[in-house]
Design a protein with these regions (language model features):
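Alpha-helical transmembrane segments
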Residues: 3-5, 17-41
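Short active-site-proximal "capping" loops at secondary-structure junctions
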Residues: 12, 50-53, 77-80
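Membrane-interface junction motifs in transport/secretion proteins
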Residues: 30-60
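A common structural microfeature
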Residues: 11, 41-43, 69, 90
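A structural signal for hydrophobic secondary-structure junctions
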Residues: 57, 61-184
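Alpha-helical transmembrane segments of multi-pass inner-membrane proteins
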Residues: 6, 10-13
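Small/polar loops that bind or transfer phosphate-bearing groups
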Residues: 21, 25, 48, 182
Length: 185
């Protein structure tokens, strides 16, 4: 076997090895990314034309009849801003029912401090993404003010609605979009 043949075989072997390594890394990355995204976002979301679903329990019941649907959970979602000691950050606020949300998302696995169980109706608790909490400089037990864009119309103009919430938990998914821009109430 000539020197050129040896170099050629070595080059082909090195190329195949590099291809195998790259494909393995990409497959692992794809699986990790899918796991993280589907841990906080469902495969399918059903929304109404105007964003509301008046009869969602009936719709959920119909969806559950499909053999490939494993679970469903209702939520409401809106944009808002949080204010703490002059620091203001915008985020997506998602209203959930923790017991039902457990069937479709893995938020409990991502909780760094606090608990989803403290999200109780009327308690005004909130769970923040880790980067959002860091940028607001808050920890579990601190208060944040939610500024909702839907306000009250007065003679002086539209006054936004303000409500104080207690941080009952902080989660970290590992994806900036969720960690810096999502809050659960």
């Amino acid at each position: 076997i000539s020197f050129i043949s040896l170099i050629s075989m070595f080059g082909i072997g090195l190329g195949v090895a590099a291809l195998i390594v790259v494909l393995s890394v990409m497959n692992g990355f794809q699986k990790e990314l899918r796991t993280r995204i589907l841990g906080v976002a469902s495969h399918i979301q059903i929304t109404g034309i105007n964003g509301e679903l008046a009869n969602w329990p009936l719709l959920a019941e119909q969806a559950m009849k499909h053999p490939e649907v494993r679970a469903s959970a209702p939520f409401v979602q809106s944009q808002g801003m949080f204010s703490v000691d002059g620091v203001v950050k915008g985020a997506m606020i998602r209203g959930i029912e923790p017991e039902q949300e457990d069937r479709v998302a893995d938020f409990r696995k991502t909780i760094q401090s606090g608990s989803l169980d403290d999200l109780k109706p009327g308690s005004f608790g909130i769970v923040l993404g880790a980067d959002l909490a860091r940028s607001l400089r808050v920890f579990t037990g601190d208060k944040v003010t939610l500024i909702a864009p839907q306000g009250t119309v007065t003679p002086a103009g539209v006054v936004p609605r303000l409500k104080s919430f207690t941080v009952v938990g902080i989660f970290e998914v590992g994806m900036y979009e969720y960690d810096s821009g999502l809050a659960l109430i």
